[in-house]
A protein has these predicted regions:
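A structural microfeature
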Residues: 1, 29-31, 107
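An acidic-aromatic
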Residues: 11-69
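Short, flexible beta-strand-to-coil junctions
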Residues: 21-27, 80-81, 135, 143-148
Length: 197
């Protein structure tokens, strides 16, 4: 039960896209990606921490590489004033499957992602499938499993409906689908659903 608002700001550098994710209770996440879908900056509302991409990643995420070859790996650090550095290592691959959701054509991807502390201790890992829009140059959430040292949960954030400017419900802060269900995972685990943008 959430709604994602995707938008651009005139004052941002070329290629920057922004996203705000809202639940029934309010904002969950706010983030920026660049034209290659690198995580430029993320704000996690439930925990109150911000992350920014460190410069010169060992293996930058590249949507262009994924589209050209069907596979892309990544290995980068983020820096946070609240929680320090975090290393993210993973990969995306095209499954070859194309889906149409609410008249929007998307390519399905498969992903795996692990987050590590600066000392190399695993913090959490996630795997599952997502979607990409070639036209919009962005990832859209899908189904996955997140595992931490103490917990594990499945998530399903697949898109249900796309609402464009001029259509009823555009810019509404209220989610429309899947609401009212009991959320069993802890609040901090819910945020992992928003990390892989």
């Amino acid at each position: 039960c959430q709604v994602d608002h995707h938008f651009r700001c005139d004052g941002d550098p070329a290629g920057i896209q922004r996203r705000v994710t809202l639940s029934e209770e309010g904002m969950l996440f706010m983030g920026q990606i660049d034209s290659e879908t690198q995580w430029v900056e993320s704000f996690h509302a439930l925990s109150g921490h911000t992350e920014r991409l460190e410069s010169n990643p060992a293996d930058p995420a590249s949507l262009s590489a994924l589209l050209a070859t069907g596979h892309d790996s990544f290995d980068f650090f983020t820096q946070s004033p609240e929680i320090g550095r975090t290393r993210y290592v993973g990969e995306d691959s095209l499954t070859g499957r194309t889906v149409v959701i609410d008249d929007v054509t998307l390519d399905e991807t498969r992903y795996s992602l692990t987050a590590f502390s600066p000392a190399g201790v695993e913090l959490w890992r996630a795997k599952g499938h997502e979607f990409i829009s070639r036209d919009w140059r962005m990832f859209l959430s899908g189904k996955g499993v997140v595992t931490t040292p103490t917990d594990r949960f499945e998530k399903n954030d697949e898109p249900v409906e796309f609402i464009f400017p001029g259509e009823a419900g555009f810019l509404s802060p209220k989610p429309k689908h899947g609401c009212g269900a009991l959320m069993s995972q802890a609040p901090e685990l819910q945020e992992y659903s928003n990390d892989h943008i």
